[in-house]
């Protein structure tokens, strides 16, 4: 009987000492404490014919974009970050919603593809101007209409669309 009690105590101690103990991997971070910025200075992305979006650079130096394609049926929504992402060996993360909303995914790819778009004035492929990425200050959030929210600190980024998104942090990045 004493062995069973000692074993149960050791097992409980191991679970409680785990950094993820009690954490719900699907738990959506609370973004209410962040200060909302005016979306207009960040609204620098347009991919012909119908995708609008906001772009920003994080205090950590990687780039992010949150977009809405309204003429699609149903509308498409997406949030992505790319570059040297903290807490993961992947260089891209994205959450996408259209017919359904799936959990975000990490991936590795050619980052130059993230900088390409189709211009509406002369429909051809162009490259995003680096000046179009405005710094999203630590402690702030960008709420993109009909899409979702991205928030940053000095060391982390969270983007949420509905019940799914991603959290980037040197302490460990995750998708939900």
Q: What does each of the following model-derived ranges do?
A:
Residues 1-24:
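Secretory targeting and sorting signals
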Residues 24-71:
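Extracytoplasmic low-complexity, Pro/Thr/Ser/Ala/Gly-rich segments
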Residues 24-44, 77-136, 166-176:
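A low-complexity, Ser/Thr/Gly/Pro-enriched, surface-exposed linker/loop concept
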Residues 49-55, 137-141, 155-157:
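Short, hydrophobic/aromatic-rich segments at coil-to-beta transitions
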Residues 57-59, 74-75, 143-144, 152:
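Residue-level signal for mature regions of secreted extracellular proteins and peptides
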Residues 70-86, 156-163:
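Lectin-like carbohydrate-binding module/patch detector with strong preference for beta-trefoil
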Residues 140-176:
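Extracellularly exposed regions in secreted/surface proteins, prominently low-complexity, repeat-rich
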């Amino acid at each position: 009987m004493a062995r069973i009690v000692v074993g149960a105590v050791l097992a409980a101690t191991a679970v409680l000492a785990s950094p993820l103990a009690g954490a719900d991997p699907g738990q959506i971070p609370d973004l209410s404490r962040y200060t909302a910025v005016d979306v207009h200075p960040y609204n620098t992305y347009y991919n012909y014919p119908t995708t609008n979006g906001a772009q920003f650079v994080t205090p950590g130096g990687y780039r992010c974009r949150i977009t809405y394609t309204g003429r699609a049926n149903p509308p498409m929504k997406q949030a992505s970050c790319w570059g040297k992402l903290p807490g993961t060996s992947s260089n891209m993360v994205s959450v996408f919603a259209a017919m359904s909303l799936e959990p975000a995914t990490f991936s590795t790819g050619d980052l130059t593809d993230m900088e390409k778009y189709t211009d509406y004035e002369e429909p051809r492929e162009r490259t995003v101007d680096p000046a179009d990425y405005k710094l999203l200050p630590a402690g702030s959030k960008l709420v993109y209409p009909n899409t979702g929210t991205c928030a940053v600190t000095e060391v982390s980024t969270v983007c949420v669309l509905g019940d799914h998104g991603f959290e980037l942090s040197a302490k460990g990045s995750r998708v939900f």
